[in-house]
From Swiss-Prot:
InterPro entries: NagB/RpiA_transferase-like, Ribose5P_isomerase_typA_subgr, Ribose5P_isomerase_type_A. The active site is at E103 (proton acceptor). It holds the Pfam family Rib_5-P_isom_A. One of its GO terms (biological process) is pentose-phosphate shunt, non-oxidative branch. Keywords: Isomerase. Pathway: Carbohydrate degradation; pentose phosphate pathway; D-ribose 5-phosphate from D-ribulose 5-phosphate (non-oxidative stage): step 1/1. Catalyzes the reversible conversion of ribose-5-phosphate to ribulose 5-phosphate. It comes from the Bacteria. Its EC number is 5.3.1.6. Homodimer. It comes from Glaesserella parasuis serovar 5 (strain SH0165). It catalyses: aldehydo-D-ribose 5-phosphate = D-ribulose 5-phosphate. This is Ribose-5-phosphate isomerase A.
Length: 219
């Protein structure tokens, strides 16, 4: 079974957490695209969605799902998103698609974070297989990079990428994260950082892993 099929299995399993007549929080990325496509079958049963990226907004609208802004809602029942890495505790690295800031905002509105992944995204230590994205105000790029080096990382500027917020991304390589919550706060306190891709303060409450044997749910 290929990776796409496993993503579809996880995405479809997440539908059980979507209640009728609610507004659903939706992230971004390839696994979320599978979820949005599945959610299209419930378009008439839900009020709509709040999306974490412009690309997700467009995909939702194309399926007839009304899109609300984060400022129009006070709370979401669930937020459903993928991850680049996830630990058994539900800590994640996200931001491969450069939507990390909006993903943090929308996920913070939700009572429950449902993370949908294929088995390749499971790790014991964050930073094992994926670089840590950091969204940075453009004028602070070099300063922030030096601070990330001081923390032990190897930051690289993600060229030709501008976030939906008009900022740039530094990807931090060779950077294993043994204390995710502490490191999330440390990096966010660097002047010029908008946010980083560690999701430890807002961790996943439920992880759904797509496998060749079906969906594995970790709560």
């Amino acid at each position: 079974m290929d990776q796409l099929e496993m993503k579809k299995i996880a995405a479809r399993a997440a539908l059980q957490y979507v209640k009728p007549d609610t507004i659903v929080g939706v992230g971004s990325g390839s696994t979320v695209n599978c979820f949005i496509d599945a959610l299209g079958e419930m378009a008439g049963d839900i009020k709509g969605a709040v999306a974490a990226s412009k690309a997700s907004e467009e995909r939702l609208r194309a399926l007839g799902i009304e899109v609300f802004s984060a400022n129009e809602v006070t709370e979401l029942d669930v937020y459903i998103d993928g991850a680049d890495e996830i630990t058994p505790q539900g800590y994640m690295i996200k931001g491969g698609g450069a939507a990390l800031t909006r993903e943090k905002i929308v996920s913070s509105l939700a009572k429950k974070f449902i993370c949908i992944v294929d088995a390749s995204k499971q790790v014991d230590v964050l930073g094992s297989t994926f670089a840590l994205p950091v969204e940075v105000i453009p004028m602070a790029r070099s300063y922030v990079a030096r601070q990330l080096v001081a923390l032990g990382g190897s930051p690289e500027y993600r060229e030709s990428v501008v976030t939906d917020n008009g900022n740039v991304i530094l990807d931090v390589y060779n950077f294993k994260i043994f204390e995710p919550l502490k490191m999330e706060h440390t990096i966010n306190n660097i002047a010029g950082v908008v946010t980083n891709g560690i999701f430890a303060q807002r961790y996943a409450n439920v992880t759904i892993v797509g496998t060749p044997d079906g969906a594995k749910i970790i709560e």
